[in-house]
């Protein structure tokens, strides 16, 4: 019995070995009395050659194959430097699982068409590489979090209130009540720290924002951490150590996939602690010196962040934001009541914010005051306020947008390419 091998396992040093391959026809061409097929599977590609002399029946069947036909092939490995992997398989057996007459995706397909047929586009080797990198980033995150003593928890997706502002909630009927899709697991993670101290979760988060920028999705994967006994500076240290490990480990394991998208790895290699830190005040000064029209107290959007990232060749922090542009749960800066103890991590090369974090307000009365200042009803947050009544402690946390991190690592032009089936204001299908 012949062992099945993956396409990427076929190497020149296997010359003369008989192998079985299963996969899909990625490319096909005919030269004389030979049919050359580039076969793909989840591991990569390999060239397979059918010749009339070796097996006329298999050769005739190979001539009929269309792109994306599924096949099982047997043959002998031959070293050939002209082949994509330095070796090819000279096939003498062909089992056609399904022949495809016409595959709708062509080389000149537009981005919008590729999204329309995303269920078919996923089989592209480039898309597969993106998903491998994304999976490896999370594999690395889990490794680091386990080593550092964090507990994974599993918060709800159906919730009763807002975390990041009521105008961006997706509303739905929950029996005889109103529920919403979660914007963030943060409030629930805060509850979990009183038993587990250091917790994290990976969940989908939903934002009903009609933003059509290259870094917004209405559904995205959210890596969130929350820890008791940590202040802002402690949690920033956690952020940089985690992101650095994720990036360096993925560079180690997925370098070839990354180099498919970017040749210059400088900024990734530079993602080593300590990351640069600048205050919001300094950020405004930098932007104004570059001719950006922005005043102290205004939030920085994608355009402002893009200009700011030109100053750095590694991820960096901006801390000390004005209170009125940040969320109600952030702790007021005791040295400047106009500000909160918050910090964002920005990726270089124009990618901007990938993490938002802060020290949380742990005082019951001050938290109620902030809720009222934001025009919200404390009754909607009774259980959350309870956390400040029974053994409240200093604590901090952050959320990382996984697709944004992937987009920076691979230099993608839009976060929609970093998720399996992107959800945007104009796209819910497939």
Curated annotation (Swiss-Prot):
Q: Which InterPro entries match?
A: Aa-tRNA-synt_II, aa-tRNA-synth_II, aa-tRNA-synth_II/BPL/LPL, Asn-tRNA-ligase, Asp/Asn-tRNA-synth_IIb, NA-bd_OB-fold, NA-bd_OB_tRNA
The answer on whether this UniProt entry bears the keyword Protein biosynthesis reads: yes
Gene3D superfamilies associated with the record: Bira Bifunctional Protein, Domain 2, Nucleic acid-binding proteins
Q: Which domain of life is it from?
A: Archaea
Give the Gene Ontology MF terms in alphabetical order: asparagine-tRNA ligase activity; ATP binding; nucleic acid binding
Q: Which UniProt keywords apply?
A: Aminoacyl-tRNA synthetase, ATP-binding, Cytoplasm, Ligase, Nucleotide-binding, Protein biosynthesis
Q: A GO term (biological process) for this protein?
A: asparaginyl-tRNA aminoacylation
Q: Which HAMAP family match?
A: Asn_tRNA_synth
Q: What is this protein called?
A: Asparagine--tRNA ligase
Specify the species: Thermococcus gammatolerans (strain DSM 15229 / JCM 11827 / EJ3)
Gene name of the record: asnS
């Amino acid at each position: 019995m012949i062992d099945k091998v993956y396409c990427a396992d076929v190497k020149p040093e296997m010359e003369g070995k008989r192998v079985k391959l299963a996969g899909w026809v990625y490319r096909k061409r005919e030269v004389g009395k030979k049919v050359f097929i580039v076969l793909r599977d989840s591991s990569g590609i390999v060239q397979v050659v059918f010749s009339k002399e070796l097996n006329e029946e298999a050769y005739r069947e190979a001539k009929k194959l269309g792109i994306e036909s599924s096949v099982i092939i047997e043959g002998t490995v031959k070293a050939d430097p002209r082949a994509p992997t330095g070796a090819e398989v000279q096939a003498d057996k062909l089992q056609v699982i399904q022949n495809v007459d016409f595959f709708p995706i062509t080389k000149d397909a537009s981005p919008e068409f590729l999204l329309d047929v995303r269920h078919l586009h996923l089989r592209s080797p480039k898309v597969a590489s993106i998903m491998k990198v994304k999976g490896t980033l999370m594999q690395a995150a889990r490794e680091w979090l386990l080593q550092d003593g964090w507990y994974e928890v599993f918060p709800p997706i159906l919730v009763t209130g807002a975390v990041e502002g009521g105008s961006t909630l997706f509303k739905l009927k929950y029996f005889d009540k109103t529920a919403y899709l979660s914007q963030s697991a943060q409030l629930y993670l805060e509850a979990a720290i009183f038993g587990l101290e250091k917790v994290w979760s990976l969940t989908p988060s939903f934002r009903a924002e009609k933003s059509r920028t290259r870094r917004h999705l209405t559904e995205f994967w959210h890596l969130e951490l929350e820890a008791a006994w940590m202040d802002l500076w402690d949690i920033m240290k956690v952020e940089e150590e985690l992101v650095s490990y994720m990036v360096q480990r993925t560079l180690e394991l997925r370098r070839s996939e990354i180099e498919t998208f970017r040749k210059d790895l400088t900024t990734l290699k530079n993602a080593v602690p300590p990351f640069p830190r600048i205050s919001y005040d300094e950020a405004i000064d930098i932007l104004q010196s570059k001719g950006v029209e922005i005043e102290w107290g205004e939030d920085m959007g994608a355009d402002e962040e893009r200009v700011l990232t030109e100053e750095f060749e590694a991820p960096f922090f901006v801390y000390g934001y004005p209170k009125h542009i940040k969320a109600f749960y952030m702790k007021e800066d005791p040295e400047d009541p106009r500000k909160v103890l918050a910090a964002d991590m920005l990726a270089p090369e124009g990618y901007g914010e990938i993490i938002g974090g802060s020290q949380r307000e742990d005082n019951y009365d001050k938290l109620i005051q902030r809720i009222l200042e934001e025009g919200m009803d404390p009754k909607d947050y009774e259980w959350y306020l309870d956390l400040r009544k029974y053994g409240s402690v200093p604590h901090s946390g952050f959320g990382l947008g996984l697709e944004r991190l992937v987009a920076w690592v691979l230099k993608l032009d839009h976060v929609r390419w970093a998720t399996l089936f992107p959800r945007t204001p104009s796209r819910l299908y497939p």
